[in-house]
Amino acid sequence: DAEIAERIVASDRLDWSEAALLSSVLPGHGSAIAPVIGFGLTEDRQQRPPIWTPHGFTVEWLRLEPGASTGLHRIDQNQALFLVEGEWQVTYNRLDNQISRTVTEDTVVSIPGNCWRDLTNTGSAIATCLVVCAGDNRARADWDPWIGNAAAEAGWGRDANGYIAPLDLLGGTPW
């Protein structure tokens, strides 16, 4: 019974971080992440998932404030988004090749690995989705240069392990 109980993650076991993505240090990027299974995409070194054993995929909750976006990034893993609440705009690709689609709750969105993506809450209430990434490894975001440079100007970067840190603690490239 205890072993089964450890594999059930109710909302009271979620550890939300509003500093889970490098973009979160920038205005207009009010996102929060709560890992559930595996280490997922979080860049907050303090976060630990309730279920950390390998499953072949990672699961985490993503929450965006009204008008906020994750910022343009890509990861190596295939990703599926289960949109639970809110109105979303999903943007694929960069620069002149961008394609955006508006989607609503109760929708599933598939994003191929290495595809640039930006998720935006276009509604007036908090938007929430469940994010599933393929593989057991932690997903490491490759941020659009604009995001990385703006974060560095704000005094933030990522350490060698890909976790957010104050720029004055980093000795090399800030992101």
Q: Each predicted region: which residue ranges?
A:
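Double-stranded beta-helix
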Residues: D1, W116-W175
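A short, N-terminal "cap"/entry segment at the start of jelly-roll beta-barrel domains
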Residues: D1-H55, A160-W175
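Conserved short histidine dyad/triad with adjacent acidic residue
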Residues: G38-R48, T58-I75, G113
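Short histidine-centered beta-strand/loop micro-motifs
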Residues: R48-T53, T70-I75, Y92, S100-T102, ...
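Conserved hydrophobic/aromatic positions in well-ordered beta-strands
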Residues: E60-L62, L81, L130
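Glycine- and acidic-residue-biased ligand/ion/polar-headgroup-sensing regions
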Residues: E65-P66, D76-Q89, N93-R94
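Histidine-centered metal-chelating micro-motifs
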Residues: A68-G71, Q89, V108-V109, G113-L119
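Short acidic-glycine-tyrosine-enriched beta hairpin
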Residues: A80-F82, R94-G113
